[in-house]
């Protein structure tokens, strides 16, 4: 199974949607909350080049945000990455 990491904020609806999609596929993921954690937020920005959440990584490959995750799934590209 792939190593999935997702940077989140507690009140972010897109974070909840992304986690719901991953959970619906039976995927375990490491949630990395950035709420009140400046160091974790800086780590996310350095890794992804983006300041918005969620930011999703599968086996250290940057996938992007929630819309990127859903688009990847719609193209049939998500499931192969999760194996």
From Swiss-Prot:
One GO term describing the cellular component: cytoplasm
Molecular function via GO: glutathione binding; glutathione disulfide oxidoreductase activity; protein-disulfide reductase activity
Signal peptide: none
GO process annotations (BP): cell redox homeostasis; cellular response to oxidative stress; deoxyribonucleotide biosynthetic process
Family matches, as Pfam families: Glutaredoxin
Disulfide bonds: 12-15
Ranges of residues in domain Glutaredoxin: 2-83
Function: The disulfide bond functions as an electron carrier in the glutathione-dependent synthesis of deoxyribonucleotides by the enzyme ribonucleotide reductase. In addition, it is also involved in reducing some disulfide bonds in a coupled system with glutathione reductase.
Family listed: Belongs to the glutaredoxin family.
Subunit annotation: Monomer.
Protein name (Swiss-Prot/TrEMBL): Glutaredoxin 3
Organism: Escherichia coli (strain K12)
Lineage, broadest ranks: Bacteria, Pseudomonadati, Pseudomonadota, Gammaproteobacteria, Enterobacterales
Gene name tied to this protein: grxC
């Amino acid at each position: 199974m792939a190593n999935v990491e997702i940077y989140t904020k507690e009140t972010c609806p897109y974070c909840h949607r992304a986690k719901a999609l991953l959970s619906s596929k039976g995927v375990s993921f490491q949630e990395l909350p950035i709420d009140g954690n400046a160091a974790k937020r800086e780590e996310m920005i350095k890794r992804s080049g983006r300041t918005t959440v969620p930011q999703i990584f599968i086996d250290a490959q940057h996938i992007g945000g929630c819309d990127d995750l859903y688009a990847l799934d719609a193209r049939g590209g998500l499931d192969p990455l999760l194996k």
